[in-house]
Amino acid sequence: MRDPPAPLFRRDNMLEFYFSYRGVLKRLRSGALGGEMDRLAEHFLTLGYKRASAKIYLSRVARFSQFAATRCGLMPIHQDVIDSYLGTFTTDTPRIGAVSALAHARRVAPERFIIPVPSEEADPDALLLASFSDYLRTVRGLEPKTREGILLGGRRFLDWFRHRHPGQNLEALTAEHVLAAVEHRLSLSATSGTRTAATSHIRTFLRFLCWAGHHRQDLARIVPRTPYWRLAHLPPRLAWGDVRRAIDAIGATTPVAIRDRAVLLLLATTGIRNGELRAIRLQDIDWRTGEVFIRRTKGKRDRVVPLLEETGAALVDYILRARPKVDSPYLFLSFTPPVGAFKSAAPVSRIVRKRLRHGGVELGRVAGAHLLRHSLATQLVGQRRPINEVADLLGHRSINTTALYVKVAASQLAEVALPFPGGAA
């Protein structure tokens, strides 16, 4: 059962939303963190925590606040005080609960804590990787998700080099070292796609080392290119009847079910990517034209996708009846506190897998938002829809990419009229 809407409280008396007894309120507002407890109460309310859960967290922080007052009074709280408090617990469960509650307190009132400064020696490559990240962003112009993968590749290369050649400077890096590192990475890669990505990431990192002056030579040319046939395998996809059955199996009886049905319908009827779905804001839906604005996609350009009537109705139902009442601009929100936008692709993938299995669909190794994207593309091509129309819907800049997704025949590609260089038809 959902909590009733919160009445209006001033920021200095938010505790009254959760507690009513004067003695309890007085105890909560005393101690080392007493002056921050109303802010903390507002924090839990803003994040959509249920009342019972918020009261538990507030009580845990209050117990620590009383303990800290005996050690440091109203002075900033040092890590030693926290460690001493956690040492009073004899079992893991209450200790874990206290750690979680204190994490919220630190987030709300960081000025009340003295955070130990980590040793610069803890990560000798931190500055180098930060510079590499800046290079990928400013020089290469790459998106955050792409940078994340390449940074991981650079980190793995450095870890290998530090482990195999401890104490050596990167200037000592040789072609033999590079080939050995590549061989090591390829031995850990199971598919042609991951092997190609691994060598590409190493190549990019080595170019950066030369560009930034960390090595006198560009050793990227040493990295061998791995064969990768993009059209060698059919992309995983479902029969459209299976997709339809999974959607119909979702009963719109709970807020979670209403949200999940809207998620599956939007993915299945527009072919948008996982990250694109998570980035949709309420203001991105044009209800008059029946369209959704998709921001700066994988192809680095915005696009618009059409809303089918059924999908639009599901979104309306979700917004009016199920969407948590929190201050967030994003369309789809997690129901697990802290309530807010999905922070990664994993929750959306779990929703897709759960609902497909519930609908009796047999799943292979790949089962996420992209499975529905492949399925829609295959369905559209099977209906003889123009390939360029499918490419526009999916946000592909090249029809060749659409061919990769849907495995179309060369004869169908030939039907597409390509523009003549210079603008003539």
UniProtKB/Swiss-Prot annotation:
Active site residues per record: R273, K298, H370, R373, H396, Y405 (o-(3'-phospho-dna)-tyrosine intermediate)
One Pfam family from the record: Phage_integrase
InterPro entries per UniProt: CB, DNA_brk_join_enz, Integrase-like_cat_sf, Integrase_catalytic, Integrase_recombinase_N, Tyrosine_recombinase_XerCD
Gene3D superfamilies, alphabetized: 1.10.150.130, Intergrase catalytic core
Species the sequence originates in: Sinorhizobium fredii (strain NBRC 101917 / NGR234)
UniProt keyword DNA-binding, yes or no: yes
CDD domains named in the record: INT_RitA_C_like (cd01188)
All copies of domain Core-binding (CB), residue ranges: 123-210
Keyword DNA-binding: yes
Segments forming domain Tyr recombinase: 233-418
Assigned protein family: Belongs to the 'phage' integrase family.
Designated name of the protein: Putative integrase/recombinase y4rF
Gene Ontology terms describing biological process: DNA integration; DNA recombination; establishment of integrated proviral latency; symbiont entry into host cell; viral genome integration into host DNA
Keyword vocabulary terms for this entry: DNA integration, DNA recombination, DNA-binding, Plasmid, Transposable element, Viral genome integration, Virus entry into host cell
GO molecular function: DNA binding
